[in-house]
């Protein structure tokens, strides 16, 4: 049997979900025999590949680059898992939305001018610094998501439960203690 092509993506978040994924410990060795990791922050691949079987997406959609890669992922991936609370709800990155939709300039002003200790200036470099969206979004607001794995971060046992089911061609049944936020 050919290994499934798996990707992990890190959008607007803290990388805690990827750290929790690494907490799979010995199961990572088993997983390595079942999958081919084709795209991830932990490997050096620059372009998201075609024909990906499963992608775990960590983080909220905060900027134009996040939105662009997300549409590419959906077009090239069979199963998308919204991985962690930021991807599922927007969570911490969406705190800036409390200032109101469209207040991106106020957020940048506060972060880079008012609270700067050295060289106060808003970073602007076309093609280098992506344009922030007017509002932070969870993944499912931009593309269809097949499965949701909440948690901040989801613990390794929940990640394993989901991966075993998805890789086995089954629909994950996350319920009870397997389905909780925070």
Language-model regions, residue ranges each:
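Iron-sulfur-associated redox domains of electron-transfer enzymes in respiratory
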Residues: 1-182
């Amino acid at each position: 049997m050919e290994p499934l092509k798996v990707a992990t993506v890190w959008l607007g978040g803290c990388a805690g979900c990827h750290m929790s994924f690494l907490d799979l410990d010995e199961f990572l060795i088993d997983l390595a025999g079942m999958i081919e990791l084709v795209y991830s922050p932990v490997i050096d691949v620059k372009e998201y590949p075609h024909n990906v079987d499963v992608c775990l997406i960590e983080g909220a959609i905060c900027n134009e680059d996040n939105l662009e890669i997300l549409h590419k992922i959906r077009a090239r991936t069979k199963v998308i898992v919204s991985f962690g609370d930021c991807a599922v709800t927007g969570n911490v990155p969406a705190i800036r939305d409390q200032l109101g939709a469209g207040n991106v300039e106020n957020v940048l002003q506060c972060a880079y001018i008012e609270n700067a200790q050295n060289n106060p200036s808003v970073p602007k470099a076309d093609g280098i610094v992506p344009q922030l969206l007017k509002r932070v979004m969870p993944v499912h607001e931009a593309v269809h998501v097949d499965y949701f794995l909440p948690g901040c971060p989801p613990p390794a046992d929940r990640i394993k439960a989901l991966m075993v089911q998805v890789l086995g061609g089954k629909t994950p049944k996350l319920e009870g203690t397997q389905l909780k936020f925070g």
